[in-house]
């Protein structure tokens, strides 16, 4: 049997490589509109003392409520006035997301599956491709906090433990709300778990969490009273959309479910796949064309094979939950691993519900909150399949890790959002020079 000691070098090596890849992505990001919105809010707060009470402009819904995005960028700048300070905080929060998820995976699964989770989550190009300063990049932390707190609340515990976990559960939803309008994904999961008796809240903790979220949103609510434009989309086409638009048009639901399968496969976002141009070889046309062709053939061939495994895994996951999905917990015994599988099933339901209600067609970043949960069926299937095959599985995982590292290195240096010629700090400093209001005030230099 594989022990924790056997996988320790591979585990810590993978963790370290993931950190290095995150730093490479961060350094070579192309600073565009979403990052500039975050930076503007942070620098206004840190340098001008103006803390905006609303977040980034969202698709068809106006600005995201709350000032969390300003604080996430501005507070690190107060501690260290460098473009790298908010970026380092972001990467640290993403590492914390992995740690929270890993604590539960370590408790429920074998060391081999834990190693697989590190690969599928921490080294996945789906995850690392978001190592840039924009609001969806923070969402894995709140997804992880939501899942971790729910796992702690599956049984009735001590008062203070359940109080803290209940408050954190609400805060996970409330803080996600202040970064992206995809927060209902978490709310639907919580609703299912509560209605089916699979989560036992401490109501004092719930009230405390609601109070904290309410206090953090109060300045935004006051702002909407005097500036209603921040709560609605100015684009007439977007205004024509309505709640339930996805259900009427059906395709948005289908596309969202495809993303659920793609997240745990290696059919990566087209921004990564089709954005790679191997521009360093543009001077040699035949080699340039050959590299692009080989890249796409390999990516789509490996992606198709991985998608087949993902479909098998989701089918296996369905067999684990179909008898329990609509039965309240008190009607039957339930193991922690069954609870884990049901949480994943709840995530699928949340994708369907939110895609049906949303006034837009989801892109991959709209569903970032469920990316970790899309891996759950794969972990369940791998735990079943790897019995007696641990050494073979570890060899497969090593090859898979090499593949993911190679894809990440290419994407971090030559894709639609990243390129070896981009310098993150240089772009930010140029932006600051072009916007005098964000320049360092003399008083803050003393």
Listing of model-derived features with the role each one plays in the protein:
Residues 129, 139, 185, 338-389:
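Hydrophobic/aromatic-rich transmembrane helices and adjacent perimembrane loops
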Residues 67-71, 79-96, 132-133, 288-297, ...:
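Loop-to-helix entry region of an early transmembrane alpha helix in multi-pass inner-membrane enzymes
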Residues 18-21, 37-71, 75, 79, ...:
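Extracytosolic helix-loop segments that constitute the early lumenal/periplasmic catalytic or substrate-binding loops
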Residues 382-414:
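Signature aromatic-anchored transmembrane alpha helix within multi-pass, membrane-resident enzymes
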Residues 161-180, 190-193, 211-215:
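Membrane-interface alpha helices of multi-pass inner-membrane proteins
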Residues 2, 107-112, 144-168, 176, ...:
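Membrane-interface transmembrane helices that cradle and orient dolichyl/undecaprenyl
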Residues 32, 126-139:
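Short acidic/glycine- and proline-prone juxtamembrane loop motifs at membrane-interface regions
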Residues 188-306:
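Transmembrane-lumen/periplasm boundary regions of multi-pass, lipid-linked membrane glycan transferases
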């Amino acid at each position: 049997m594989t022990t924790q000691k056997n996988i320790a070098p591979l585990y810590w090596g993978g963790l370290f490589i993931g950190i290095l890849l995150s730093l490479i992505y961060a350094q070579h990001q192309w600073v565009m509109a979403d990052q500039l919105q975050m930076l503007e809010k942070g620098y206004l707060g840190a340098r001008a003392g103006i803390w905006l009470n609303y977040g980034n402009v969202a698709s068809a819904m106006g600005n995201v409520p709350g000032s969390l995005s300003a604080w996430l960028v501005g507070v690190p700048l107060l501690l260290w006035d460098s473009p790298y300070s908010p970026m380092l905080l972001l990467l640290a929060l993403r590492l914390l997301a992995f740690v929270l998820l890993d604590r539960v995976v370590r408790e429920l699964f074998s060391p081999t599956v834990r190693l697989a989770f590190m690969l599928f989550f921490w080294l996945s190009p789906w995850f690392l491709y978001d190592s840039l300063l924009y609001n969806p990049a923070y969402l894995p932390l709140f997804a992880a906090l939501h899942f971790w707190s729910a796992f702690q609340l599956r049984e009735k515990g001590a008062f203070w433990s359940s109080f803290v976990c209940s408050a954190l559960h609400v805060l996970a939803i409330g803080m996600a709300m202040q970064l992206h309008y995809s927060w209902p994904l978490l709310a639907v999961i919580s609703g299912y778990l509560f209605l089916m008796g699979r989560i036992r809240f401490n109501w004092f903790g719930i009230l405390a969490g609601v109070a904290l979220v309410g206090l953090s949103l109060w300045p935004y609510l006051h702002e909407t009273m005097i500036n209603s434009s921040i709560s609605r989309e100015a684009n007439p086409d977007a205004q024509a959309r309505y709640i339930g638009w996805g259900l009427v048009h059906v395709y948005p639901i289908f596309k969202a479910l495809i993303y659920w399968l793609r997240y745990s496969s290696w059919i990566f976002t087209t921004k990564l796949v089709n954005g790679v141009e191997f521009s360093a070889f543009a001077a040699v046309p035949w080699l340039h064309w050959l590299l692009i062709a080989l890249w796409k053939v390999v990516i789509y061939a490996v992606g198709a094979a991985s998608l087949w495994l993902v479909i098998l895994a989701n089918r296996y996951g369905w067999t684990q939950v179909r008898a329990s999905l609509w039965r309240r917990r008190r009607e039957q015994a339930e193991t922690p691993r069954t609870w884990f599988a049901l949480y994943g099933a709840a995530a699928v339901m949340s994708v369907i519900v939110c895609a049906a209600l949303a006034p837009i067609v989801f892109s991959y970043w709209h569903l970032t909150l469920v990316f970790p949960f899309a891996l759950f069926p794969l972990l369940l299937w791998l735990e079943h399949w790897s019995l007696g095959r641990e050494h073979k599985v570890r060899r497969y995982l090593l090859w898979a890790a090499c593949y993911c590292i190679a894809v990440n290195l290419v994407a971090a240096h030559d894709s639609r959002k990243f390129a070896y010629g981009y310098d993150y700090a240089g772009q930010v400093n140029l932006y600051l020079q072009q916007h005098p209001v964000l320049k360092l005030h003399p008083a803050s230099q003393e």
